[in-house]
Amino acid sequence: MAEQLTEEQIAEFKEAFSLFDKDGDGCITTKELGTVMRSLGQNPTEAELQDMISEVDADQNGTIDFPEFLNLMARKMKDTDSEEELKEAFKVFDKDQNGYISAADVRHVMTNLGEKLTDEEVDEMIREADMDGDGQVNYEEFVRMMLAK
C-alpha cells in the first residue's frame, strides 16, 4: 500500500508523524493521538482512539509505528477525500467561520499543532492556494488545493 507514495509524500508524513509522536519514541499512543485530534478541534473518546489505532496496528502492540502510519495515510489517500472530510478540514482552518481561510487562521491551526511557521511560510501557503488573489482561501480554492495532491 505505502509503495504508491512518492518520496515527497513520505517526507511529509514523517514530519506529521513526529508531530503526533510527542516523546519521540517512534510510536504514536492513544494519548498522543488524542492530543493532536483535540488540537484540531475534535473530541474523540478513548474507545474511538483505540479503534483508530487498532485499525492500522499490524503488530497489535497498541501503538502505531511509522510503517503502520504510512499504510494508514496511503489508505486514506486512496479513499480520496470525501466532500464531508473536506468540509470538516476547511472548518478547522476557518476559525471565525466567515467562509475564508486567512493567514491568521493558518497560523493559529499550525501553532496548535506545535508547528512554528514564519510569516513568510504562512503567506506562501496562502499564495499557493489563493487562485483569485484576494489574500485568503475560499472553500473552492481549498478543495482544489486538497485534490491537487
UniProtKB/Swiss-Prot annotation:
Name the UniProt key words of this record, in alphabetical order. Answer: Acetylation, Calcium, Metal-binding, Methylation, Repeat
What SUPFAM superfamilies does its record include?
Answer: EF-hand
Residue numbers of N6,N6,N6-trimethyllysine PTMs: 116
Which residues are noted in the entry as Ca(2+) 4-binding? Answer: 130, 132, 134, 136, 141
What GO molecular functions are on record for this protein? calcium ion binding
The record's InterPro entries line, in alphabetical order, gives: CALM/Myosin/TropC-like, EF-hand-dom_pair, EF_Hand_1_Ca_BS, EF_hand_dom
GO CC term (a single one) = myosin II complex
Q: Which residues bind Ca(2+) 2 per the record?
A: 57, 59, 61, 63, 68
Q: Which residues carry this modification: N-acetylalanine?
A: 2
**Which SMART domains does the record cross-reference, listed alphabetically?**
EFh
Family the entry assigns = Belongs to the calmodulin family.
Additional comments on file? This protein has four functional calcium-binding sites.
How is this protein named in the record? Calmodulin-2
Q: Which organism is it from?
A: Petunia hybrida (Petunia)
Q: Which gene encodes it?
A: CAM72
